[in-house]
Amino acid sequence: MRLYYASVSDFAKIVLPEAEGYEDSRIISKGNILLKHGKSLKAVDVYLDQGSLSEKVTGSAKRWKQMSELSFQLTGMTPRNLGFLSQTGNSGLVFFVSDSNGRVWVLGNLRNAAYLTSGDATSGKKFEEDNMVNFTFSANTGLYEYAGSIAEIGEEAEKKQVGGFSRGFSKGFRI
């Protein structure tokens, strides 16, 4: 299974729904996620049998808060996988996860990014055991469904300088 992600600082916008209805309050409209110019989503292939995406409600009466969690494993204790563990350790990320029903779930947003809460690598104690790198990312927000596809998440247009006063307007004027 392939997960897509980007640093929260790579996004130009992620517009969360403002609807009141149950379903509509959790669907991000197509076109409401945009990367900054020159940025793109990265992908990582995860071990299919051991991944999960969940949402929990924690707290006490009148103090409930939502928390979402993504757990997955990468096969092999390799320099690439260990590098992914160390590079994402303190970075705020936004993940895009396709489920078996064809929905694209969004974990994290501009206000509440997903952070690594648990990560460990093991070579396995016995020869037959898998060597894996385990990850758990959490965000203090609910999960949102993206109404578009992952391929439709584009980047903002390059900002061009327009007009005669875009550069050097303080030079060359005589009064």
Q: Residues of each region from the PLM?
A:
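Solvent-exposed edge beta-strands and adjacent loop segments
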Residues: 1-69, 113-127
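Short, hydrophobic/proline-enriched secondary-structure or compact coil segments at domain edges
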Residues: 3-6, 70-73, 91-100
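Oligomerization/assembly interface segments of phage tail-like spikes and tubes
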Residues: 58-80, 129-143
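A general structural signal for short secondary-structure junctions and capping/turn motifs
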Residues: 61-62, 85-87, 96-97, 125-129
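Short acidic, glycine/tyrosine-flanked loop/strand segments centered on an H-E-D-like triad
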Residues: 71-74, 100-120
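Short, acidic/charged, Gly/Pro-enriched secondary-structure junctions
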Residues: 83-108
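Mixed-charge, glycine-accented linear interaction segment located at domain edges/termini
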Residues: 112-175
